[in-house]
């Protein structure tokens, strides 16, 4: 079955496509190799423009985590019934994540997965998790999250500044738009986005 996203991608010749994957999909090296990589290749194959620039939106670590996070193993059949038909799978075939001891370890695992993707796909990969991690350590008063997973208005503005820099290669500190944020916070976020 063709998804709406696949229909849109194949409907025209795109110059830029930004791909995002759920962070949990990046916690298993095997899952990245067997599913994420092939999903990216499928997206690329649907686009008519062979000179398209592809970016991978490397999302941030969730805000609230109780560490350690135990290794989670899920049957391969839960992920893709076309790629892993249930009747062809041994019931023991699973994707397993690593145990995550702390937030720094979580960041390391995400970055390793993205390096794995980049080695094969040669995509521009955003630096969101490292930027969020550093802001959390250096500016704990800045609330980047609305809830455990989603960005607040401040976090969304930071994300927009990061993408502005990635897509245009222009300095976001020159933008006058502040999204209704106070000047001090907006200026700091623009500087951080520009320096990464």
Where do the protein language model's features map onto the residues?
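Alpha-helical cap/lid subdomain in secreted, periplasmic
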Residues: 3-149, 153, 174
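Conserved catalytic region of serine esterases and O-acyltransferases that act on ester linkages
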Residues: 142-196
């Amino acid at each position: 079955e063709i998804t709406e996203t696949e229909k849109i991608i194949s409907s025209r010749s795109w110059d830029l496509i930004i791909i995002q994957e759920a962070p949990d999909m990046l916690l298993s090296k095997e899952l990245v190799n067997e599913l994420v990589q092939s999903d990216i290749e499928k997206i690329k194959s649907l686009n008519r423009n062979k000179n398209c620039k592809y970016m991978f939106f490397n999302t941030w670590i969730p805000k609230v985590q109780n560490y350690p996070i135990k290794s989670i193993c899920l049957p391969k059949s839960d992920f893709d019934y076309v790629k892993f038909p249930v009747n062809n799978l041994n019931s023991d075939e699973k994707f397993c994540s690593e145990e995550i001891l702390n937030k720094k370890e979580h960041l390391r695992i995400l970055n390793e997965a993205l390096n794995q993707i980049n080695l094969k796909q040669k995509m521009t990969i955003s630096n969101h998790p490292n930027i969020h991690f550093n802001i959390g350590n250096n500016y704990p008063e800045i609330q980047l999250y609305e809830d455990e997973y989603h960005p607040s208005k401040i976090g969304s503005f930071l994300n927009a500044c990061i993408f502005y820099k990635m897509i245009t290669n222009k300095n976001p500190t020159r933008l006058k738009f502040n999204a209704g944020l106070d000047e001090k916070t907006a200026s700091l976020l623009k500087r951080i986005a520009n320096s990464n």
